[in-house]
Amino acid sequence: MELALVATVLSLLIGIPLGVITAIHRGRWYSEGLQFVSIIGVSLPSFVVGILLILVFAVTLGLVPAFGRGDVVQLGWWSTGLLTASGRASLLLPSLALALYQITLVMRLVRAEMMEVLRSDFVKFARARGVPRWRIYFRHALRNCLMPVVTMTAMNFGSLIAFALITETVFQWPGMGMLFIQAVTFLDMPVMAGYLCIVSFIFVTLNTLVDIAYAVIDPRLRDATR
């Protein structure tokens, strides 16, 4: 859960600004370069990205641990490594390996939606009125691009939790995926059934949260329910 959460946050914090930049400055060399890098990011599987990250940042540079979770802090039923330095360092590489694919998807989706919104009449009217460009891009245009991003992020978050098996195996991360692999190895049926129930509950909860987020982002949906 912790690994998927950090990967999702990274994908949004990096992917959305990159999508806006490539849409605003389309045709520029750096925009085309980001587009090319995004194709590579979509093409590479997560375990290859993980191995490359380990080789560069853990083995060659020695900046972060190559595997494990580091020190954790127990908060009731939840143990987290976000509150310790070694836990955050151990979280960096696997979360980046998971987030790279999501970053490219978010960037390309925001770029496509942003380019369509920038051709809208309300954007032209805002420019004619002299509204600052940053306000047009990040307050008005970007808000109209977030609906598909919310949907994709929620579905990918559930997929990260359910299918991050290979990444957890590469980094020896003691997560739900590793637990499921061990349960399959030893034919532990109660654990497998519990894992599937938890994943199903997560997907149902995410769908509900997406519907709520739609009403928050788009005021027209709130008005339609009145």
Residues covered by each model-derived region:
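Membrane-water interface segments at the C-terminal ends of transmembrane alpha-helices
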Residues: 36-68, 90, 97-103
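Alpha-helical transmembrane segments of integral membrane proteins
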Residues: 1-30, 46, 59, 75-226
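Membrane-interface interhelical connector segments
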Residues: 68-75
